A protein has these predicted regions:
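Single conserved hydrophobic/aromatic residue that forms the stacking wall/gate
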Residues: 408-420
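Short helix-loop-beta junction
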Residues: 83-86, 208-220, 330-339
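Glycine-rich, anion-gripping cofactor-binding loops and their flanking helix/strand elements
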Residues: 211, 224-238, 331, 340-394, ...
């Protein structure tokens, strides 16, 4: 085995092209190294919004986890949080269940038993299943339909399939579709908009709220701000949806097909000029003009202040944070900083940033967190003195680290840089 961590420079990747990304940087082509840097990534119930926590985004919902005992153990971390007490239930599978699939017949009864034991009838029961049922080929839609008929409550599937992580519809894409599937058609209101993509709200002082209000929008819905199921249902009244995360596209398409609500996508960007261009495009689509000079100036001043304090900053940018590591690295280079290393998952979608980086920072190295040779990662020649992302912080423990992982999402791109 190679005794050093595999990497490519962005210049080398650009020369290879997006259709020839080295197999070492594509995780489904090799053995997976469960690096300590990505433990939270590999254990979605342990931190942030993994499949299980996201599945409970619908107010008054509960979840039945159908799995072998080893798959559900990390849920105990979530169960200890006040907001999730008495919302997780388990149907454990034994070896016979795995061989015969008999556990599927138990699910409707388990759902009914959960509902009967609760003081308040749940709005929906989410059935969370694991890779075991993926390998068995379980038709979970059919199972949920039977459970719904048996228990008399809505039942929806929630797939915790690590096997489909890099497929057409990964678990976090599917769960977003599931949590909005309960919405029923309502009369549309021209001054209502939904924000789709996150399971926690934007910061209260996010400029997006002011821009939308200035455009005549009176009500902005986010699933995380819905206090009860009735308020959740008012999301069907929206005139249009704003998609803030690409994993919400399927959900937005479902909105369009079922509820006739169109959508506009806004990407999470950290290049101030690109953010301004995106806002201009949104304003043009809505037939209005946005006044974004104040937040833009604040962002530019934050960058300048940070550059004055840390003129010699050399960054390592990880993927375990709120953003695309390649786009963020490109933004940092544009702001005058050096980016020595990126730890990320390359795709055709973010390869455009690699091409741009190759022109202005050709020696930036790209590593894959899940590549086995990361066992031999050596930081000694990197020159890094600042890191962004939990994974980057793991590789450079002695450096200043910004987790950039707040559950309350910050839209203004450089507010994270306001550190001394």
């Amino acid at each position: 085995m190679r005794q050093e961590a595999y990497f490519c420079t962005v210049k080398e990747l650009d020369e290879l092209g997006k259709n020839n990304i080295p197999r070492q940087l594509i995780s489904h082509t090799h053995l997976i190294y469960s690096s300590p840097a990505t433990l939270a990534f590999n254990s979605p119930g342990a931190e942030g919004f993994g499949v299980k926590r996201a599945g409970l985004a619908v107010p008054d919902s509960v979840m039945l986890i159908v799995s072998p005992g080893c798959c559900g153990r990390n849920t105990s971390v979530l169960s200890s949080m006040r907001a999730y007490q008495d919302r997780f239930y388990y149907l454990l599978m034994d070896e016979t269940d795995i061989v015969t699939g008999r556990h599927l017949k138990k699910i409707p009864k388990a759902v009914a038993e959960i509902c009967e034991g609760l003081k308040k009838k749940p709005s929906v029961v989410m059935i969370c299943i694991t890779c075991v049922d993926a390998l068995l080929g379980t038709d979970m839609e059919r199972v949920c339909h039977k459970a719904e008929e048996y228990a008399g409550v809505p039942v929806r599937p929630c797939y915790m399939y690590a096997l489909t992580r890099e497929g057409r519809k990964p678990p976090m894409v599917h769960v977003r579709q599931s949590v909005y599937s309960l919405l029923e058609p309502k009369k549309k209101k021209g001054n209502v908009v939904n924000l789709l993509g996150y399971f926690s709200p934007l910061t209260d002082d996010c400029e997006l709220y002011d821009l939308l209000h200035g455009a005549g929008v009176k009500t902005i819905h986010e699933i995380s701000r819905c206090k009860d199921y009735a308020q959740y249902q008012t999301m069907s009244e929206a005139n249009f949806n704003l998609v803030l995360h690409p994993e919400a596209r399927f959900a937005a398409e479902d909105f369009h097909d079922r509820l006739k609500i169109p959508y506009i996508e806004l990407r999470r960007l950290y290049q101030i000029d690109k953010i301004a261009s995106q806002y201009r495009a949104l304003a043009a689509a809505l037939g209005v003009e946005f006044e974004d000079e104040i937040p833009r100036k604040a962002a530019e001043e934050a960058v300048e202040k940070f550059r004055e304090i840390h003129p010699d900053a050399v960054f390592a940018v990880g993927e375990w944070m709120n953003g695309d590591p390649f786009e963020l690295a490109l933004a940092l280079v544009h702001y005058g900083f050096r980016v020595s290393e990126i730890y990320g998952t390359l795709s055709g979608e973010n390869f455009v940033y690699v091409k741009q980086l190759a022109k202005i920072s050709p020696d930036t190295k790209v590593f894959s967190n899940l590549e086995p040779t990361m066992l031999y990662y050596d930081k000694s020649q990197s020159g890094v003195n600042m890191t962004i992302g939990k994974d980057a912080g793991y590789y450079h423990k002695e450096c200043s680290n910004v987790l950039w992982l707040s559950l309350i999402h910050i839209s203004e791109p450089t507010r994270h840089l306001r550190i001394s």
